[in-house]
């Protein structure tokens, strides 16, 4: 057993992975990234709240969808809030929410970039201005893609059903588009991951293929965890009948979830660094 273990850790890829993982400082960085993700939720919610009224979504249809996922006691509170949200837009609040979301998300990208740099063994960061501009650019691009993926996953099928009902059409095209919603969401998430691993680290990634292993690992791991999480929510959400208890549980679960996602993203960067180190002499470890 010891001989087998020694042979395993002496393999170049495994040896590189262990080296870069120890250098990544994932324990501390993942908590910092998760913290800024958590506080960025509130301005993002404000953005959604102030955009929805412009779509003129029928309140009754929206409430029917929400009612399917929430227990009755929670729904009574949420329904009142949703009714106000869908009828009272605020342009000033929307501008503030967008700026706040960009700031908090860019801060999380700063910490994630530091973790990626450590994973690649890069001690020197970009200059202050270029560092902030890169974080802002990546944050803005990721938020657009993430918002599109979230919109398709949450509202894609509902929007297609509304269009189908409005046109009163029985065309199989709508069923085909509904079947494409899931794969399209996964394709967008994979594009987000490739963009993240290619642009964020302060290291020259010479080939796109060097970031594909980590992106694929994160994609498959998140898909598995999301399926497990959805099963858990479907089985236990009805037991959370107290609104205050429900809110506190959601915050704790989201913080834990964000820490886990940050750790997985850092492991993805470590995998990419390990693969590239086998091909790039400048990343090769001793």
Question: What is the role of each PLM region?
Answer:
Residues 1-286:
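Membrane-embedded alpha-helices and immediately adjacent juxtamembrane helical segments
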């Amino acid at each position: 057993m010891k001989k087998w273990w020694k042979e395993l850790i002496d393999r170049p890829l495994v040896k590189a992975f262990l080296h870069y993982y120890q250098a990544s400082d994932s324990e501390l960085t993942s908590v910092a990234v998760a913290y800024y993700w958590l506080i960025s939720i509130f301005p993002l919610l404000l953005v959604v709240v102030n955009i929805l009224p412009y779509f003129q979504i029928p309140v009754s249809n929206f409430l029917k969808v929400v009612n399917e996922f929430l227990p009755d006691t929670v729904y009574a509170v949420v329904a009142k809030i949703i009714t106000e949200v869908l009828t009272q837009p605020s342009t000033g609040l929307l501008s503030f929410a967008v700026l706040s979301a960009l700031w908090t998300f860019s801060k999380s990208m700063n910490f994630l970039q530091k973790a990626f740099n450590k994973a690649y063994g890069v001690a020197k960061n970009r200059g202050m201005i270029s560092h902030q501009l890169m974080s802002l650019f990546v944050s803005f691009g990721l938020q657009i893609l993430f918002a599109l993926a979230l919109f398709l996953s949450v509202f894609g099928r509902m929007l297609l059903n509304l269009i189908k009902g409005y046109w009163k059409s029985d065309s199989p095209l709508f069923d085909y588009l509904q079947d494409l919603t899931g794969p399209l969401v996964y394709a967008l998430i994979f594009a987000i991951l490739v963009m993240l691993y290619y642009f964020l680290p302060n290291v020259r990634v010479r080939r796109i293929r060097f970031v594909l292993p980590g992106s694929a690992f994160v994609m498959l791991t998140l898909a598995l965890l999301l399926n497990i999480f959805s099963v858990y929510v479907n089985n236990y959400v009805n037991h959370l009948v107290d609104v205050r208890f429900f809110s506190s549980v959601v915050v704790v679960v989201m913080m834990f979830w964000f820490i886990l996602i940050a750790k997985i993203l850092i492991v993805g960067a470590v995998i990419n660094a390990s693969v590239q180190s086998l091909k790039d002499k400048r990343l090769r470890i001793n």
